Structure formats: structure tokens, C-alpha cells
Amino acid sequence: MTFPATDGITDRLQALFAYDASSPLIFSSGLFLFLFAGFLLVYSAFRRAPMARIVYVIAFSLYFYYKSSGIYFLLLVFAAASDFLIARGIYRARFRWTKRWLVVLSVAVNLGMLGYFKYTNFLIDISNQLFGQGFLQFQNIFLPVGISFFVFQSMSYTIDIYRGQLKPLSNWLDYLFYLSFFPQLVAGPIVRARDFIPQIRQNPVVVTREMFGTGVFLILTGLFKKAIISDYISLNFVDRIFDEPLLYSGFECLMGIYGYALQIYCDFSGYSDMAIGIALLLGFRFPKNFDAPYKSATITEFWRRWHISLSTWLRDYLYISLGGNRKGRIRTYGNLLLTMLLGGLWHGAAVRFILWGALHGAALALHKLWMAVVPGAKATGDQMHWWSRAAGIFFTFNLVCLGWLMFRAESMQTVELMLHQIFYNFNAAMIPQVVSGYAGAFALIAAGFLLHLMPGRADRFAQRLVSHAPLVLQIVMAAAMIWCVMQVKSSDIQPFIYFQF
């Protein structure tokens, strides 16, 4: 005899431990919030037991990654074992050439993993275009979530040890903890070993009132950005425009591009906010990953504000390794272009990502040339007159949006069609009708940009207000935010955009 209630519980438990590619465990899901509450309760019992805490967090982190990528969580374990051993070999090696070969081995293993899973079919497609369809057969290769992030994070560890900037860990579990720590595992920020590792064995774990309040604030703002702004405008406006641009006027196509600029910012910075906030609740500090990038008055400033952990990684481990700005002006421009081309390729195996990287690389090189030949040219808006800064923000934002058009479009034909509609079929007379027809989406787009462009002191004031509020009030605010999310969310899970990278 079976009991329906028992069957229901069994089904839910099976779903809890089964991998489902269509239902990854993401920060904005009710399941994650429920699991994290339970995790946090047990975690607090280990605040004075470093080893038990490390094992407990690793177990939850691997479970978290398993729910996103299935059996490929073993790839993460392999990467941790490989670079842990290689790093110790680098540190112990007596000869410079031995150290060099070992760091090359680390880079080869990491890029080999990344290349196989991410770029095999891209290279097969290029080969078929060059030598005829059917020259090579496409492979059914699964792309593990966030592989680009943990590969870069692991490479930075071995490179820092090779450069003599870091000593290797003696305990493999500490390194596995660093590489698999679930808040930043699948979409960053890319955390440097020298910043994070000293925090692992803190005893006891200290979560101050300021850390707890700031963590709550960041989780709530991240949830708002992702589930209310990004997901809503994506499903109800942006996706429709990019799917069938010829069905829409040039104004709608332009607003679709602007909407995507806000969508990807709210999606990615929302994840980063939640990751940083969750880490704070666990007693860890992550670096800031976004700093109001659409306030940038130059493309150089944009890359100091957008995905800061990636841009600094590319600067420290690629641009400087290529020679940086130490080899003359022409070499500097070439290094910038190559760095951003590879940065574009890091985002995905498609021509559109390479073109996106090329656009940004060329823009950075031209801006550096501009500063070299024009007296008084500035690198950031803070150094400009207000009118020059306003013009710079307008120009930089639209240049970045041109890049987002390439980044989002499924093909270059979509790029051409949307630009054609904007320049030849703008149809300004339809603007009032379009705005009223998409009132909800346009209201959220306007609100999102207004909040983004507010002075930094307003954001800091709101953060202090929430972080210093009584615990009961913080709980009420969290419950209210979750209720709002439930009212506007789609029935389908909307993964974070950067999960695919």
C-alpha cells in the first residue's frame, strides 16, 4: 500500500538530489533561498571549527555545481587537484626552466579543458566552412557551467606562484575550497588566491553587524536587478525584438538594444551583488565587480567599471605578459587589441563575440592614441568639465550598445536587420503607441537607468539604511522582496546570462 503524501515527499527528495539541465540551482530561485537558509543555520555551528567548516562548505559547493552541471563537477575536482600539485612543483623547483615548464603545463591543462569543452565545435564549424560541409562531424559536447571562470581563477594561482607573489597551500582541501566556493563559482567575480586564501582558516569566523547588513542589502538589490528588472524586460520586450527585428520599427529595435544593455547589466551585476552578499554572510569579502559602468565618459573608464575582476585579470595575466605599454606605442595598441579579442573569445565560441572584443580593443587603442596626441584629453569623466562628461557618457554608452548588439544577436544578419530598421525605418510617429503597448517594460527600463545613474552617495545611503536597520526590519524587507519576485517572475527558470561562459 502506498501513501500519496509519502510518494510526494519521495519525489521531492529525488528532485533535490537529481541533476536536471533545465532546472539549475540559481541564486534567484526559491529552492536556493530555502537551501541556503538551512545551510547557513548549520554553518553557524562551525564558526570555531575551521576543518569541519571547510569540509562542509566544499560538500555544499560541489552539490551546488552538480545541480548546474551534473557529473562534470568532477572536472572542477580534477582542476583543483592538477593545479594544487603543479603549484607545489613550481615552488619546490630549483631551476628557472623547470618552473617555466611547470607553469606552461598548468596553462596547457587549463586551456586544454576550456578549449575542448568550449571551442571544439566552433573549430569544427570553421573547418567545414573552409573545406566543405561534412569535412568534420560536430561533437555532442556538454559545456560545464562557469568553466571559464574557475579555469581563469585556477590559472592565476599557479602564475602567481611562478612569479613569486604567493606561496602554495599545503592542504589540498584549502585549494578545493578556494576554487569551488559556491557564491562565485559559476559566474564570478574571479577571486584572486592572494586575497581569498588568507580568509579560509579564520578562527572564529567573524560576521560583524555591518557585514551582515551589507550582505542582506546586496542580496536584496541583486534579487531585484535579476528577477524583477532583467528577467521581466528580457521576456516581455528584448527577446521579442532580437528574435524578429523586421516585425518592429527602428525605434523598437533601438529600445531593444538599450533594453539589453540594462538587462545584461542587471543580470550580471545582480549575480555579483548576490555572490558578494552571500559571501559576507559567511564571513568572506569579495572584491567589487561593477561600479555603475554606464556612467563612464570614456571606453577606458567603462572597462574600469565593468566586470572589474575580468578586466583586471586580463590586464595582469595577459596584457602585461604581452608587454603592456612598455614596448612602444604601436605595440601597446596591438596588445590592447589582442587582449580584448581574446577577452571576446573567452565569452563564447562565436564570431559575434570576437567582433565584440575587436570593437572594444579598437576603441581602447583609439582612446589611448587620442590621449597621446590631444593635449588635455582625459581618461575618466571625473577629470572632465560637466558638458564634456555628459557628451562622453552619451557617446560611450552608444558605443557600448553597438557592442551589445553584436554580443546578443544570434547572427550577423540580425545585426544588419536591426541597424537597417534603426536607420531606415525608425517611424517616430509610433513612439507613443509603442511606449503605451510596452508600458511595464518601458517603466522598468526607465527606472533601471535612473537608479543606475543616481549619485554614488545615494547608493551608499541606501546601503547604510538597510545594513543598520533592526534584524526584524531586514527580515520584513527580504520577505517583501521575495513576494515581489514571486509576483513578476516567469514560470520558467531564467538562468543568469553569464552561466553560459
Regions found by a protein language model. Give the residues of each.
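Membrane-embedded transmembrane alpha-helical bundles that form the catalytic cores
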Residues: 2-451, 455-500
